[in-house]
Amino acid sequence: MSSDLKQTPLYQNYVDRGAKIVEFGGWAMPVQFSSIKEEHNAVRYEIGLFDVSHMGEIEVTGKDASQFVQYLLSNDTDNLTTSKALYTALCNEEGGIIDDLVIYKLADDNYLLVVNAANTEKDFNWILKHKEKFDVEVQNVSNQYGQLAIQGPKARDLINQLVDEDVTEMKMFEFKQGVKLFGANVILSQSGYTGEDGFEIYCNIDDTEKIWDGLLEYNVMPCGLGARDTLRLEAGLPLHGQDLTESITPYEGGIAFASKPLIDADFIGKSVLKDQKENGAPRRTVGLELLEKGIARTGYEVMDLDGNIIGEVTSGTQSPSSGKSIALAMIKRDEFEMGRELLVQVRKRQLKAKIVKKNQIDK
């Protein structure tokens, strides 16, 4: 493995725990500690912990910070509070998704954008390019933050025992600042990428290992990127670089809820997104279940039963929960019909599949 890969503060911790390390977005990350299935099931039915410190953090501060983030992002950031985060997209002028991200309003003039690891530099440069007309400062503060995700049905009860705040009633994307966890000050966000209840913990980078080790003392399973991928795919959650790209809009990529083109404020890509909201997008993302043995991989062609190509698979795996072969695919809008049978070209075979809902959690 290349020595040029970036490492999170937990890299040596992974090695000591015998994790299998892979390259992901320029980082050396654990794909698994025990087995993907074991880690997947721990999160789906009990509790697991992920290191996601490779994610990027970009800070926007200054007098025009609120207007600037609204101009950059496709969702309506105007109603953000200092206790409610928002999932949104950074779009280009054609409405294509440069990145999907979560934005936190830390103060009236201070916003934290949490972006995908592989896109951090690209996003940062894009944001810098568009700041000229605004009185703002933009900083890449990724090297100041550690980020952990504790996920699963038992996560809330454990966190409630360990922090100095009551998290019982916290709802999706609510967050609290200045929470104490193992003596460290953290931002605690009710969010995740697994389809399960849980929290994302933002801490000073120097506190990452203390919190990681502290949580693992409570019979929490360490989990790698392999389980993170199968969990998000079962839940129908898109991955940027596969299901979302710069040539896919929020309406095509299945994240229409992250686009609000009817608001008064202008934002980059608004005209294209407004047209797609009113008239429909040419393509749409669907869930697929293969009806024959095989795995649908990214880029595999999707066809109607006559063999006409109507789209392609964007992500696919075998579900550890159900054992079924599941996928997300992008198809022509007019070809969509729930339950419809299609074909997927898997190597030299055409396998039958059917359109199902994107969230395929089966437990």
UniProtKB/Swiss-Prot annotation:
Broad EC category: transferase
Domain of life: Bacteria
Residues making up the signal peptide according to the UniProt record: none
Membrane-crossing segments per the record: none
Keywords for this protein: Aminotransferase, Transferase
UniProt GO cellular component terms: cytosol; glycine cleavage complex
Subunit structure, interactors included: The glycine cleavage system is composed of four proteins: P, T, L and H.
Name of the protein: Aminomethyltransferase
Organism: Staphylococcus aureus (strain NCTC 8325 / PS 47)
UniProt gene name: gcvT
